[in-house]
Amino acid sequence: MAEKGLFHKVKNRPTRRRFVVSTIRKDENLFETAVFEANFFYMPRRWNQPEFTVASSTPGEAWDLHAKLTVRLTHEYPARIIQEYLEAAPAPR
């Protein structure tokens, strides 16, 4: 597989906030999609603290999630999306 990761700059239309959606391959069967709030130049405000992360086990699942988040962050209110994914994620121990 030639693709190692995906990266998209997103400007939210309702709030005009900027985000970066990044998907990377962490391991052979582990992909991580992270959403960062960004500044005017689309540089993440906090590199080590994304708004949320979602793990995937297959490349197809990771790419689909990346595309879905990119579209949703463009059109929907970001707080609603962030809350949805934080509630779905298991609590750290």
Outline where the language-model segments fall.
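A short, exposed loop/beta-hairpin motif centered on an aromatic-Gly-Thr core
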Residues: 41-64, 68-69
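Short intrinsically disordered, low-complexity segments
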Residues: 37-38, 66, 92
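Short arginine-rich
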Residues: 67-82
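Generic detector of bulky aromatic hydrophobic side chains
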Residues: 33, 55, 76-78
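Intrinsic-disorder/low-complexity coil detector
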Residues: 13, 43, 49, 58, ...
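Intrinsically disordered, low-complexity charged/polar segments
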Residues: 81-93
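Short N-terminal "domain-start" leader segments
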Residues: 1-35, 39
